[in-house]
């Protein structure tokens, strides 16, 4: 089994952990409906950039058919 030659310094430990920080996800408000959603994602109503992309009623009818 591999064993390190010498102990890692706090500086090296910090540099290794520098990419582990948690970041809050950025939320946006839709222009048409005012619904809150993740950036670059479609809303639950089917809107993206203020335009209707997906019609839920048609999708439900396709699934049930």
Curated annotation (Swiss-Prot):
Keyword terms: Ribonucleoprotein, Ribosomal protein
Protein name: Large ribosomal subunit protein bL32
Keyword Transcription: no
Record gene name: rpmF
Pfam families: Ribosomal_L32p (PF01783)
Single GO term (MF): structural constituent of ribosome
InterPro entries (UniProt xref): Ribosomal_bL32, Ribosomal_bL32_bact, Ribosomal_zn-bd
Cellular component GO terms held in the UniProt record: large ribosomal subunit
Biased composition (Basic residues): 1-19
HAMAP family, sorted: Ribosomal_bL32 (MF_00340)
Keyword Ribonucleoprotein: yes
Family: Belongs to the bacterial ribosomal protein bL32 family.
Organism: Vesicomyosocius okutanii subsp. Calyptogena okutanii (strain HA)
GO BP terms in the entry: translation
Chain residue ranges for the region called Disordered: 1-32
